[in-house]
Amino acid sequence: MPPTMSSSPSSPTFTAVQTGVSVRAKAGGSSSWQFWGRIFVVPYLLIFLVFVIYPVGYGLWLARHPDSYTRLFADPIFFRTVINTIIFVVVSVNLKMMLALFLSGFFLNTRWWVKILAALFILPWAVPSIPTILSMRFMLNPEWGVINSLIFNLTGRDGPNWLNDPTLALSFSMLAHIWKSLPFWTLILLAGRMSIPAEQYEAASVDGATTWQKFKFITWPAMSGLYLTSTILSMIWTLGDFNSVYLLTGGGPADLTHVLATLGIRYLRLDQVDLSLASIVVALPLVLPLVYFMMKRLSK
């Protein structure tokens, strides 16, 4: 009589069957989760296609005519706008990030009054852009603004018309942008500083390292990657900053303080939709390399 196959729980056959059933069950469960995951992604994908991909594609299609770019490049305001944009981005980003790096070290202090200052420091970023920038515009009013009123009370002379001078107007636009966004980048770099082990600074102090040496050999090597990534992202956001210029100066005086983010509105007001779209397309060569470099940094 041939021997019968054992089917006890401890037998190898039973274990193999149980393992196969378990693997199939896990595979079935994984497939179910993947199916429902795709179902839940569909609404977001549709929203992205309808409200992002379609408008961008349609705008590029409308701006396809070479004549639009010929007329755009023939407009002297466009070249002034390009120069303004370069100045706005280079000055704002560098000042903002250097100040954020310095202030992130200051706010590491654990004293109670530093904590109060840190809470107050967040307010410009927490408050919406429109009231923040409009309040600065009211302060700069040449007739009843608080700045000119203070100048008159102290000197007996009328203050300048701040926003009627292109250089001053663009400078105050950069100041408004820095004031609004500086708290955010300070928080980012503060988080980076807090991630550095305190033991490294303690060991450096024992070795007699100065504050500058600690920054040079401990802080900066640990934060250089975060600083670079933050700078690239800040450049992208600064290129797209519409509120700081438009709400403060409206592109004036005489359309001399426009940046690429606001130039399209000028052409729309003149009923030149093709030039408005062309001015946006021209900004893409500035933005896309930054986005590409940013994605490469994040993928490492």
Give the ranges of each region predicted by the language model.
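Transmembrane alpha-helical segments of polytopic membrane transport and secretion proteins
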Residues: 1-41, 112-114, 294-300
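A structural signal for multi-pass alpha-helical bundles of membrane permease subunits
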Residues: 33-300
